[in-house]
Amino acid sequence: MIPAAPDCAPVEQRRLLSPEDRQRLAVPPSPPEASPRPAYADRLQPSSLGWVSRRSWCVWIEPDPQPDRFSGLWRQAVDTALARWGRELTLQPVERADDAHIRLWRRRPPRQDGRASLGRALLSLQMVRRGGADRPAPLVDVLLDPGQRLQGLQATALHELGHGFGLWGHSDRPDDVMTAVPGPRPPSDLSPRDRETLRWLLGRPSLFRPEPPPPTP
């Protein structure tokens, strides 16, 4: 385990944002954009407090108390998906679920609007205290059904992690990991459009990023 970075220091307190927090942190409307958004960035939606965007994320993976072949495949798919996103972002493993921004759970998501799904990302905006300082932070629970074949599970993990990392929207092309309708061979890696959209997002102002955004290309 890599030693925890300062931004992944133990969480001392965590709570949902209160109405007073939301009023204080409210983001003013953005001015009109001077140029069209790249790739499928025009399909992304901000949260109620603006873009959920970070360059570094603390990640926790649910351990399996009784490892077997199927749980090994689940972990292999998750590790591969994280490695793909880790080429674009800094992903720091943490040992406690409460210290994470992203938590990956080995479970089938509950039905939503009567429909079943193989994966889901659930976003919660919270106030988190680390080192005595309170900061707004995202918490994303990623639920991944372990009853999938390796290829499908990896594609599901790539897609739901994309939501977790701030890509709250879907591409209209089947070769992007954030596609709304995957083709017969789901993507196994980020496409150039996925990377371009993520880099655009990382250039937007965000309450949830401890570091300044990089220069916009």
Q: Model regions: which residues?
A:
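Generic beta-structure capping elements
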Residues: 62-64, 107, 181
